[in-house]
């Protein structure tokens, strides 16, 4: 009898614990709620914005993925990150692929489409939301390659057609008058071929630092090649650099080397006002600007802190909603401007000389923000 009582108590305890566990494991409300297929289809698509980023391992794709993490708001807004080949294919997708509303691309890609491909009405069809961090041209080669000239007639991989490097890298060699044997394969495979001697260099345009390069072990026999900035690159490119701290295993015997960099841009299709697609983009931009502070802290990419929302892109038109949001922010920040102006004057007084071009001004602005953050 006693054993039966104990058994019943144990069974009751197990049932009780199981019931509590079930109560704790609540199915999310968004999954529980049912509706007709038509209603669900409408709800899922009403505020979904497609943004094409780039290669899955690239920084551009991480930017888009982080926008989704920071801005997604159930059925009110959903960012759909789309993987692609890179900056050049992104602009193609923004122009022609169904479901794409925005894309990360580059200023030189836009100019190439406008002047060389002569894409009809590009200036009116594609506008921008904000500038993104610059992307540096990385050229990785075996140690015997000491300059770009050493790659004349050699095999250089630019990544699959459509990547930023397949356009920017090709333009760089063309402008320098260096003919190379162009290879267009994925970069992980190209790295293996570089190590085995089947290709002589790989080119990749991506914001630094990137694990693809920084994780190359020491004594690999590979290094990043110095790219001197000349007048040939003054139109759409700026001076960049790589340091020993960023790539400790790829700058043997050097603390830093030069490279060229190109401006990345968050581009948007200029949908007709009052259309459904325009409303989607409008809501996305409102969320982006209103939650901008979210991107300034970990775990978000540190390059977000380099972005100046007010910075312009020469030759491009800012999307009207972005311009309106920017003006609202500037009005809200008006009380801070006098103090910031005084801070900037103090900062400038400690500089050896005034900036000579846009690249120097942007660099000075970043340093000013860092200096200001330390003071306040």
Cite the ranges covered by each PLM segment:
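Hydrophobic/proline-rich hinge and linker segments of small-molecule sensing/allosteric domains
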Residues: 30-34, 127-146
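An extracytoplasmic/periplasmic, membrane-proximal ligand-sensing/linker region
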Residues: 189, 195, 206-220, 224, ...
């Amino acid at each position: 009898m006693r054993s039966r009582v104990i058994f019943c108590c144990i069974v009751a305890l197990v049932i009780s614990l199981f019931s509590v566990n079930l109560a704790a494991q609540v199915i999310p409300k968004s999954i529980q709620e049912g509706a007709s297929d038509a209603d669900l289809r409408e709800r899922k698509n009403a505020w979904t914005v497609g943004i094409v980023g780039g290669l899955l391992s690239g920084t551009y794709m991480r930017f888009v993925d982080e926008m989704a993490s920071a801005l997604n708001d159930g059925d009110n807004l959903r960012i759909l990150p789309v993987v692609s080949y890179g900056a050049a294919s992104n602009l193609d997708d923004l122009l022609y692929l169904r479901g794409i509303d925005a894309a990360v691309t580059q200023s030189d890609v836009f100019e190439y489409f406008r002047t060389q491909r002569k894409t009809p009405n590009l200036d009116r069809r594609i506008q921008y939301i904000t500038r993104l961090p610059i992307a540096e041209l990385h050229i990785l080669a075996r140690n015997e390659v000491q300059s770009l000239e050493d790659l004349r007639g050699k095999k250089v991989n630019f990544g699959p057609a459509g990547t930023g490097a397949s356009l920017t890298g090709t333009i760089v060699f063309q402008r320098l008058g260096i003919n190379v044997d162009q290879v267009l394969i994925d970069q992980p495979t190209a790295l293996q071929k570089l190590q085995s001697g089947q290709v002589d260099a790989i080119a990749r345009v991506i914001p630094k630092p990137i694990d693809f390069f920084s994780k190359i072990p020491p004594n690999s026999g590979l290094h990043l090649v110095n790219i001197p900035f000349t007048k040939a690159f003054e139109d759409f490119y700026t001076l960049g650099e790589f340091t020993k701290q960023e790539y400790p295993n790829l700058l043997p015997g050097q603390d830093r080397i030069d490279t060229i960099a190109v401006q990345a841009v968050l581009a948007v299709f200029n949908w007709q006002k009052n259309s459904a697609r325009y409303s989607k983009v409008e809501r996305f931009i409102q969320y982006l600007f209103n939650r901008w502070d979210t991107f300034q802290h970990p775990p978000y990419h540190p390059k977000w802190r380099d972005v100046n929302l007010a910075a312009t892109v020469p030759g491009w038109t800012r999307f009207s909603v972005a311009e309106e949001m920017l003006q609202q922010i500037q009005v809200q920040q008006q009380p801070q401007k006098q103090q910031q102006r005084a801070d900037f004057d103090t900062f400038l007084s400690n500089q050896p000389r005034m900036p000579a071009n846009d690249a120097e001004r942007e660099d000075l602005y970043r340093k000013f923000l860092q200096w200001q953050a330390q003071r306040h």
